[in-house]
A protein has these predicted regions:
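Extended, composition-driven regions rather than compact fold-specific motifs
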Residues: 1-272
Length: 272
């Protein structure tokens, strides 16, 4: 397998964009397609390419962004007065079309006990209209598969689905391994262009009875062996990421061959 070089840009570029269209991809996923004058030059690398998303506050007429040089954007961002500081969140590129200068962003739609959509970014996505402003700060990729990897194991909850779908499309044709993908409902399944040698397991979470990430972790723990020359990518709810890494390491996969990232943390209890 060709080496995928882990890349965080030294001088990340900020791209201003506007909404082109939106659509509900599945019951739990809202897609927002955006474009912008410079977006045709977005340095897309495939795999789990991610970015910082900046959204203007509801009362603002214009989107205010931090002014920075190099990669030091965080302090300039915090220096913006709180009532003018844009909302910032991390997202993966769901798809990118360079010729059209269009980029797709998938937002997980989670509803609280009242039935209302929760989360500032998800609320924005569900109400987004053509012309709405936003900005993307390129952050590169995390997927870091060694050139000699014998197999690939990818595990995620729904927050990692945009990344895993893109990873499946980006993997070389001869890749072998497995994907364990947790989703809230059976209707959230989607077509994945995975290599023929990658076994795809959809794990549907039991509505209202299971902590997000727990079902994927249970499925991963059914794995009783891991090739020490393989590679793993585990993302999603924090406990899924950390406990998934721990299990794979116990099976013999070296820590340096495991990429893990907690995209979020469940507020009530651990997924273990």
């Amino acid at each position: 397998m060709a080496k995928v070089r882990r890349l965080t840009p030294q001088h990340p570029e900020m791209f201003r964009a506007r909404v082109v269209r939106t659509r509900r991809v599945s019951p739990s996923m809202q897609r927002v397609t955006v474009t912008g004058p410079g977006l045709g030059g977005f340095p897309w690398l495939g795999y789990d390419h991610w970015f910082r998303l900046f959204l203007q506050l509801p009362h603002q007429r214009d989107l205010r962004l931090p002014e920075f040089t190099g990669s030091q954007w965080w302090q300039p961002y915090l220096a913006i007065p709180e009532d003018e500081r844009p909302h910032c969140a991390n997202y993966s590129v769901a798809d990118y079309r360079r010729t059209a200068a269009e980029l797709d962003i998938d937002f997980v739609v989670h509803r609280g006990p009242s039935g209302e959509v929760e989360g500032r970014a998800a609320i924005w996505a569900c109400g987004a209209r053509p012309g709405d402003a936003l900005a993307l700060l390129d952050q590169g990729i995390l997927f870091d598969c060694p050139h000699d990897a014998s197999e690939v194991t990818v595990v995620a909850d729904e927050t990692g689905l945009p990344a895993t779908a893109s990873i499946m499309r980006s993997l070389p044709e001869g890749t072998v391994g497995r994907l364990i993908q947790e989703i809230p409902t059976d209707a959230d399944r989607r077509e994945l262009n995975a290599p023929a040698g990658v076994a795809v397991s959809w794990v549907v979470r039991r509505e209202g009875t299971s902590v997000p990430g727990a079902a994927a972790l249970r499925e991963l723990r059914r794995l009783t062996r891991a090739d020490a020359s393989g590679y793993a990518f585990v993302v999603g709810e924090s406990t899924l990421a950390t406990e998934g890494r721990r299990h794979l390491h116990r099976l013999g996969l070296p820590k340096e061959r495991i990429t893990f990232s907690g995209f979020w943390k469940h507020e009530a209890m651990a997924a273990a």
